[in-house]
Amino acid sequence: MKRKSVLFLTSVVLAAMLLGGCGKDEEKDSASVLDDVSEETVEVEESEVVEAETEETEETEEIPEGMYRSELTNEWIDESLKDQRPIAAMVDNEKTALPHYGLSDADVVYELMNSTKNGRITRLMAVVKDWGKIEQLGSVRSTRPTNILLAAEWNAVLCHDGGPFYIDPYLAEDYSAHFSGGFDRINNGKAREFTEYICTGNLDSKFDASNYSREYDKYYEGKDVDGYQHFQFSDEELTLDDKDGVINATTVSLPFPHNESALKYNEETKTYDYYDYNNKHVDPGNGDAVLTFKNVLLQNCTFHQYDENGYMIYNCLDASNRDGYYLTNGKAIPITWVKVGDTNATRYYDMDGNEISINTGKTYISLVPDDGWKDLSIE
């Protein structure tokens, strides 16, 4: 309530006003009751004026029948998939393994240093929600401990073919679900290690022969009151133009010498096309579709080398808010990231400490070795 001082006029002045106001409709202040005509200042309460608020019509998003927004991309997909857990497939990124099949169907793709040897060769991990539509994905290779931890934050079933003994304690964890080997072999004229692919029916057979649930289980940390949540998606298209520290980001060169990995912004599609070995990545299993991403997340990450053979693990469990970048629509902003537990999602924050939102679409994530962070180029 507001208060105001009301100056009570002398009886003579009041009488003159009343006489002058005869015959006219006047608004009267309900708080102005004259009990004394002497001149004094009195505190009285004035009722707040409540203005009629214009009722704003909230725009309700029209939900296509039988569809829901994917927790991996925020794109509309079949509602029957809502509770289905994704798979995370290890894909060989050696030049001999090219071309890759099925990567354009992945929702999230990780690129990680697979070894400190051989020019820090990378391996890809493709996270796929609608794995039932896979016709051919791969070629499939071995996993590393880091991949087990990253797959766990999606509650994804890791698909691989073996790996060094360093993976054993991670695979033994109750939260770990994985299928190792036994996928189809394709006669492609290459050495045997480049011939294994996840093909139609493989995953159904694997699930049928296992005790793993096809649906999210109790180890999934991404469930909230609105459903399954991992990334925070923006309701509107983000441009980053108004964000602190924004820089132009149309070309990204990653410090992986063997693969010469890069991302180039495509003005027509408004996405980042992936390149390796100086060539644009295409998927012959999907009409030579370009592997392209709406979002790019780069994480500065320390690592531990196990032995002289180059086997290593990223220290991806880190609560110290390490550096990173988020890229979309040709711009980049500095961010920090944390992952506080094996099954916890990696969270990304802006320079004010707020969790970032990202655009609807596919996402590329790379853990960049901390000793090579200075060699990361964003232009």
Q: PLM features: what roles do these ranges have?
A:
Residues 52, 58-110, 117-379:
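A surface/extracellular/periplasmic glyco- and lipid-processing/surface-interacting theme
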Residues 31-56:
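Post-signal peptide N-terminal segment of mature Sec-exported envelope proteins
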Residues 13-14, 323:
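Exposed boundary/loop context
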Residues 23-25:
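Bacterial signal peptide processing site
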Residues 5-7, 44, 57-60:
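Intrinsically disordered, low-complexity repeat segments enriched in small/polar residues
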Residues 18-21:
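C-terminal motif of bacterial Sec signal peptides marking the signal peptidase cleavage site
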Residues 1-8, 13:
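Positively charged n-region of N-terminal signal peptides that target proteins for export
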